[in-house]
Structure formats: structure tokens, C-alpha cells
């Protein structure tokens, strides 16, 4: 699998989140940014398991992604974060990212992987990034695909 392309494709899928009109659009990046414009989603660390099937036919990637929200008002920031962490709805990161799975019989992420699954939310807390404090959380995304490509 082409990890750099997968990172960018996950970020591109997250851009489809629809936030309320009064809020800025979600910004997204495939890598940990030096600085952010909140709210911001980015692909951070990953773990890779090779050879989940014979002949390099399947590798598994576990991406840790983060979403950070500005804290102008702690309650409204957490409500916005909650909406992005929900399992469904126009602001749901899970829902918009899993649309990139493609239809039945299609490869995920525009052909970059066999499948993906947003598995869990963790680490709901205050984060410091580039000297500023944000409320945020991590989403774990499993991606499986051809090991030899």
C-alpha cells in the first residue's frame, strides 16, 4: 500500500464533514501540521502489520487520527467535537470517512486499499499543539490492502 497516498485520501474523505453554517469549515491534512486552523482533522501516527495473508497479499495499517477544536467556549467546543465523533450525521467523521470504502465490489480510498473501518474514538481531552490548547480526540482507522503494491 502507498502510505502517503492513503494518508491524503483519509484527509480528503474527512473534508466532506458538514458543520453548522455559523462555524468555520473543517480543515484537514494527511500529516501532523506545524500549526492548525481549528477545527482541524489530521492523520498522525500509524502502526503496520505485514503479511496478514500469504505471499504479501495483505497488510494492515492502524492510523491514529486527531480532530482538534478551538476552545473559545469550552461547552460549545465540546458540543462541536461530540457531533464530529458521533457515529452518524452530517458532521460525523466516521460516516464521511467510511463513504470512502466505496460500493460493493469496489476498492476503498479510490483504489488504494481493499477496505477501511473507523474503529473507535479515544483520548477525548485537552491537547496542546504548536503552543495553543484545543479540545480534541483521536479516531483509530484500520486500513487493509495489498502488501506488495
Please tell me what each predicted stretch does.
Residues 1-34, 45-149:
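Charged, amphipathic alpha-helical segments and their flanking helix caps
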Amino acid at each position: 500500500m502507498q502510505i502517503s497516498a492513503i494518508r491524503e485520501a483519509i484527509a480528503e474523505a474527512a473534508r466532506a464533514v458538514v458543520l453548522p453554517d455559523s462555524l468555520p469549515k473543517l480543515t484537514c491534512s494527511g500529516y501532523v501540521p506545524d500549526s492548525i486552523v481549528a477545527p482541524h482533522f489530521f492523520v498522525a501516527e500509524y502502526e503496520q502489520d505485514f503479511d496478514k495473508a500469504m505471499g504479501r497479499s495483505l497488510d494492515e495499517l492502524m492510523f491514529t487520527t486527531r480532530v482538534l477544536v478551538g476552545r473559545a467556549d469550552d461547552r460549545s467546543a465540546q458540543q462541536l467535537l461530540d457531533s464530529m465523533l458521533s457515529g452518524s450525521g452530517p458532521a460525523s467523521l466516521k460516516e464521511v470517512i467510511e463513504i470512502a470504502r466505496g460500493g460493493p465490489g469496489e476498492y476503498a480510498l479510490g483504489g488504494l486499499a481493499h477496505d477501511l473501518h473507523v474503529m473507535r474514538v479515544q483520548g477525548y481531552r485537552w491537547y496542546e499543539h504548536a503552543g495553543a490548547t484545543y479540545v480534541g480526540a483521536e479516531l483509530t482507522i484500520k486500513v487493509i490492502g495489498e502488501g506488495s503494491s
